[in-house]
């Protein structure tokens, strides 16, 4: 099993969602709002914490857990949709999941 994490600008969520849903066997995803800190801001010199906190930018994080074969297809689909953007628009990574349990409540 693999976990895919995708961090994108909020405006790109719909485009990524459509590409992922088009993959046969799409298992669903978790989406949450996060803040990113651009690398360039850390190189701009000494700042106060208050100034640094205002430099965070809104992003959306997508998390998907899927079988190895499906995860590769989902990863490739997301890369294809996002690879033509600007630097800093998105980040995608995939890691191994050693064990997972999906709990379902019934009744």
Stretches found by the model and what they are:
Residues 1-107:
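Positively charged, small/polar-rich N-terminal and surface patches that mediate targeting and assembly
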């Amino acid at each position: 099993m693999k976990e895919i994490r995708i961090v994108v600008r909020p405006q790109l969520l719909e485009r990524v969602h459509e590409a992922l849903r088009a993959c046969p066997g799409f298992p669903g995803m978790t989406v949450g709002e996060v803040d990113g800190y651009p690398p360039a801001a850390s190189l701009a010199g000494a700042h106060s914490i208050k100034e640094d906190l205002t430099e965070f930018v809104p992003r959306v994080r997508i998390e998907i857990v899927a079988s190895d074969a499906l995860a590769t297809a989902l990863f490739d689909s997301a890369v294809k949709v996002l690879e033509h953007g600007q630097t800093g628009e998105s980040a995608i990574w995939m890691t191994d999941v050693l064990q997972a349990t999906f709990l379902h409540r019934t009744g």
